[in-house]
Amino acid sequence: MARPDYYGNPAGLTDEAGVVRAIYDAFARRDLEGALGYVSPDCELDLAGTARLAGRSGPYQGHDGLRDYFRDVERVWEELLLHTEDIRVIPGSVIVIGHITGRRQGLVVSRSSVWTWRVKDGRATSVKVADLGDLAQT
């Protein structure tokens, strides 16, 4: 059964989900410039999985941090795809439930994930990803 358009965003009152969707779409195209337009210049990007693989110890900071993240993805992953399965909006925040699939050094990776975004004035101000472990196989 398909969910109604307003699912997780009652009455479609907020556009935060659109901002986050645009960032995911830009990432899928590896369109850094497209993503930058939706990210605050002082954003904090706590994307620990890729950061750890790239040898970083803290979050990516600001637009330069987003540039570093895109470079790190290209450097440490042969392939990395983000899959959004459900998006929930609470004014000011967007919760994305989904998973990642990737390939690194010939190994296939599938992990359940939850991304918590903060959005203000039409731009993402932060994101934190929670790695929920190996994706259950059905």
Give the location of each predicted region:
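C-terminal and inter-domain tail/linker signature
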Residues: 1-138
